[in-house]
Design a protein with these regions (language model features):
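Positively charged n-region of N-terminal signal peptides that target proteins for export
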Residues: 1-4
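Short, solvent-exposed aromatic-acidic interface loops
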Residues: 71, 100-104, 199-203, 230-235
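Short loop/turn motifs at secondary-structure junctions and domain boundaries
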Residues: 45-49, 201-202, 207-211
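C-terminal subregion of chymotrypsin/trypsin-like serine protease catalytic domains
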Residues: 22-24, 30-36, 40, 52-74, ...
C-alpha cells in the first residue's frame, strides 16, 4: 500500500487544517532536529480543496528528495520545511517541478508485495530555500555492509497514530514533523536488491511509518545520511512491514545527481 495521502485542507491564503492522514507512528515532535526534512503537497485539479501529501528531504537549496509515486509530474508541487502548522501558502511553501525516476513503475516491483520499482523522485524548486541544513547522499552499497538491527531514524509528516474504539480506527493527524528511531531488518531476498525493510509495528520505544510518510528519509541513525526513501507498507493499519527504496544504488544516485 502506498504511503502518500490525499487530504482535505482548509485553504484560503494559508494551509492550516487537515484531516485523515498518517505519518511516523510512536514518534515525537521533531522540532529542529531534522530541519532539512519537509512536506510536499500537490493540489488535485478535479478535487477542489484536496491535496496529495508526502514527505521528503532537502539535498541542496533547490533539490528535494522524495518518492516517485507521490505526485503527478504534469502539475506543480509545493514544498515547505516548517515543522508544523499554521502554514501560509504564499510564504512557507516554494513551488517546484516533480521529476520521478524514468523507470518508476507501479506493479513492477520485485518479490511478493511487488508494489513498485525505482520509487525515487527529485523536486526541483523554482527558488532556492535553505532550511538550515541538508541531507546527505550515501556511498554506493552502504546498506549492504550495515549489520542487522542498525539504528535508523525515520522522519515525516502526517498521522501520528490511531484512536481505536467502535468501528474503524480513526487517524490522528497534526500535520507536524515527527521522528522516531527504528531498526534495519537485513534480509537476503529479491526485494533487498532495491528496498530496505523496517518494522512498521511500534514497540519497545521504536517507531513505524504509515500513509503520508512517502518519500521521507530513512536516515542512518544519528546522521543526516539518507539510506532510503519511504515507499510502501504491507497493511492498512501500518502494523506490518515498511519497505523503503534504497538510495545507495548506483543508478539511483546517478539519477539524483543528474537533476
Amino acid at each position: 500500500m502506498r504511503t502518500k495521502l490525499i487530504v482535505v485542507l482548509v485553504i484560503s491564503a494559508f494551509v492550516a487544517t487537515a484531516t485523515r492522514v498518517m505519518t511516523v507512528t510512536n514518534g515525537q515532535p521533531d522540532g529542529n532536529r531534522h530541519p532539512y526534512v519537509g512536506v510536499a503537497i500537490q493540489f488535485i485539479p478535479d478535487m477542489p480543496g484536496f491535496v496529495t501529501v508526502c514527505s521528503g528531504s532537502a539535498l541542496s537549496d533547490d533539490r528535494f528528495l522524495t518518492a516517485a509515486h507521490c505526485f503527478d509530474p504534469d502539475h506543480e508541487v509545493f514544498v515547505s520545511y516548517k515543522s508544523g502548522p499554521p502554514f501560509i501558502l504564499a510564504t512557507d511553501f516554494t513551488q517546484g517541478v516533480f521529476n520521478p525516476h524514468p523507470d518508476w513503475c507501479l506493479g513492477c516491483g520485485p518479490g511478493l508485495p511487488g508494489f513498485d520499482t525505482h520509487d525515487v523522485a527529485v523536486i526541483s524548486l523554482n527558488a532556492p530555500r535553505n532550511p538550515g541544513g541538508f541531507a546527505a547522499l550515501p556511498s554506493v552499497g552502504l546498506v549492504d555492509v550495515l549489520p542487522m538491527r542498525t539504528e535508523v531514524d525515520i522522519v515525516g509528516y502526517g498521522v501520528q497514530g490511531f484512536v481505536r474504539g467502535d468501528g474503524q480506527p480513526q487517524q490522528i493527524f497534526l500535520f507536524t514533523r515527527y521522528f522516531a528511531p527504528s531498526l534495519l531488518i537485513q534480509s537476503n531476498n529479491v526485494q533487498s536488491v532495491e528496498f530496505i525493510k523496517l518494522t512498521a509495528n511500534p514497540s519497545k520505544g521504536k517507531g513505524g511509518t504509515c500513509f503520508g510518510d512517502s518519500g521521507g528519509p530513512d536516515l542512518l541513525g544519528g546522521t543526516n545520511i539518507v539510506l532510503a526513501v519511504n515507499s510502501y507498507v504491507t497493511n492498512g493499519n501500518c502494523a506490518g512491514v515498511t519497505y523503503s527504496n534504497r538510495v545507495d544504488l548506483q543508478e539511483v544516485l546517478e539519477f539524483i545527481n543528474g537533476i
